[in-house]
Structures are given as C-alpha cells and as structure tokens.
C-alpha cells in the first residue's frame, strides 16, 4: 500500500484537541516520574515522553467502537482511550480507586467500557490478543477495527508472526502499529534484527505496511487515517511502523547509558510538542494566550489527579483473592 502524502490534514479543532492531549500526556508522565522518585509509585514504570504524537494521531482517527491494546508502556494509550487521568494515576499508586483496583499497576491498565484491553507485561503477548479482538469484530459483523500497538523489540517474538499469519489467513480488521523508538530495552534495532524496515515484517504473509515519522503529528494523522481506512474497507491487516523516540530510559530504573546525550538532544530538536505548537501558531489556529490557557488547564488536571490519588484508600486485603484465575 502506498500512502498518499497530505491526503488528509487535521482540522483546526483536531489540532487544538491534539495539542492539549499531547501536553496532558507529557505533564502526566513527568509527574509520574517525579512520584516514582519519591517512592509514591512502586514496581516498574515505563514513560511515554517523546512519543506523544503517535497515540494522539491514532486516537484522532479512531471511530467509536474501535479497540486499543498495547504493551506495558501504556499510560498514554489508556488516557486517550477515555479513562480519566486520576484513575490511571490512582492505579499507578496502588489505590483502590485505580482503573484496575490498585492491583495492576503501571503495566496492567485496563478499561473495558472504553475498549482498552491493556497494558501487557510480556513482550509481544498483546499482539495475538489484539488479533483476537479483531476476529471478534469480524465475527460479530461490526465495522470496528483493533489498533494493536507493539514495540520494535516485540517484532522478533514468535507469537507475533503467528498472529500475523492468522490475521492474514482470516482477513481480520487489525492495524498493527510498531512504535519503533530505536531501542528494545538497551538493545538497538540494528543489533537485534536483520530486516531494519520493520513495516516489511509482514510481507511473507501478504500484509502491506509503511513507515511514518512518529514525531510529526500531521504526518502521523495522514498515515493513520489512511491505514484505518484501508483495514476497515478491506477487512485485512496492515502494519504501520512509526519512527519515534523515548527521551527517558526504558523504565524508571534504566539510566540509558547505551546511548549518548548528543543522540537524545538531537531527537529533542524535533520534539512533537514543539512541532504541533509551531504549526498551530503559524496557521493562526490559536494565539499564545490560548495555548497558555490550555497549559494551565492541563496543569490543573494533573494536580487534581495527584490529589485524588493521594486521598484514595489502599485496596482491602480481600481484593487479593478476587479476579484470580488459573
């Protein structure tokens, strides 16, 4: 499939909403990093800082009824799926009011009413499940699709290719989105896979794919909209590789010494928030005062999330024995 450049362009309203969404994700993740350092968040914590344009664009082109599933770097995905940030932060802080009742933590966020199916701690494990979600949509005769996110490290997992094969064989409406942030934990793409154009990983199954600049919201929007259109119309999978970058380590416990400060700064020069902000101002979609007002509202949302979470109770001990399956 060939992506047509600039076939679709975000509207003024979509630009403004996405700027607010991306800023909220950035400030939320920054606060999570701060709270983790203070010992308020335990366990693993994988931040999405730097990658905000990817999920924001996908969320903008999603239709009501579409589902989302991803890996353990999932805070941003569940928030844009419709979960209030305060319930996400409460979960990270292990509170009973969290979206997973304080039992899932950072890596296992769920919101079934908003069709967000995790949050999965096993690398690549969400891909067969996302394929199954797409099967359910086809079986039930809907026109919904499933956006299944995975990282560059997950593309080397065997179960991913089993899922690709099944999706192609049965013609399932799933968009596989590879968030290629260059490093699988500390291992670069160049050191982990021979085929570095990850969007070509499905070619042997007849699955088309293409690559996008994940730091550019407008390019992401155009590509994601065409990808969703293709999958919805053809009831057939497609692979979307987005080149992006995480500014922080793999997790909060990772000092990221496998890459240079110069490399990180080079990517920060193309910060997705800076790009979308400049586009909005250049096109006179909003003024500096308008954007500052948005920034203040985002600050209040994060502040309220912290207050809500701190004042929420810990789960009752009896919760240890609920929702346990074997």
Curated annotation (Swiss-Prot):
GO terms of molecular function: pyruvate dehydrogenase (acetyl-transferring) activity
GO BP terms, alphabetized: pyruvate decarboxylation to acetyl-CoA
Pfam family for this entry, one: E1_dh
Cofactor: thiamine diphosphate
Record keywords, A-Z: Oxidoreductase, Pyruvate, Thiamine pyrophosphate
Enzyme class, broadest EC rank: oxidoreductase
Name under which the protein is recorded: Pyruvate dehydrogenase E1 component subunit alpha
Organism: Rickettsia felis (strain ATCC VR-1525 / URRWXCal2)
């Amino acid at each position: 499939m060939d992506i047509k450049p600039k076939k679709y362009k975000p509207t003024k309203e979509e630009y403004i909403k996405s700027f607010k969404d991306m800023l909220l994700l950035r400030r939320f993740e920054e606060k999570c990093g701060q709270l983790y350092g203070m010992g308020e968040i335990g366990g693993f914590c994988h931040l999405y800082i730097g990658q905000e344009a990817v999920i924001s664009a996908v969320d903008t082109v999603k239709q009501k009824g579409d589902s989302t599933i991803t890996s353990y770097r999932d805070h941003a995905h569940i928030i844009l799926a419709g979960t209030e940030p305060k319930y996400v932060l409460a979960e990270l802080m292990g509170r009973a009011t969290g979206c997973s009742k304080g039992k899932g933590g950072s890596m296992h966020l769920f919101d079934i009413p908003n069709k967000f199916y995790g949050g999965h701690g096993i690398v690549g494990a969400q891909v067969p499940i996302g394929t199954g979600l797409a099967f359910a949509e086809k079986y039930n005769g809907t026109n919904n699709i499933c956006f299944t996110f995975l990282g560059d490290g997950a593309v080397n997992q065997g179960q991913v290719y089993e899922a690709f094969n099944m999706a192609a064989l049965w013609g399932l409406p799933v968009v596989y989105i590879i968030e290629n942030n260059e490093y699988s934990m500390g291992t670069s793409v160049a050191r982990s896979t021979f085929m570095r154009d990850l969007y070509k990983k499905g070619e042997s199954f007849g699955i088309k794919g293409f690559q996008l600049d994940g730091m550019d919201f407008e390019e992401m929007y155009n590509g994601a909209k065409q990808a969703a259109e293709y999958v919805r119309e053809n009831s057939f999978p497609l692979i979307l590789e987005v080149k992006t970058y995480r500014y922080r380590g793999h997790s909060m416990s990772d000092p990221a010494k496998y890459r240079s400060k110069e490399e990180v700064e080079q990517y920060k020069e193309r910060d997705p928030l800076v790009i979308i902000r400049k586009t909005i101002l250049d096109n006179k979609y909003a003024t500096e005062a308008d954007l500052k007002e948005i920034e203040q509202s985002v600050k209040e949302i994060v502040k309220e999330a912290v207050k809500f979470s701190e004042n929420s109770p810990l789960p009752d001990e009896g919760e240890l024995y609920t929702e346990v399956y074997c």
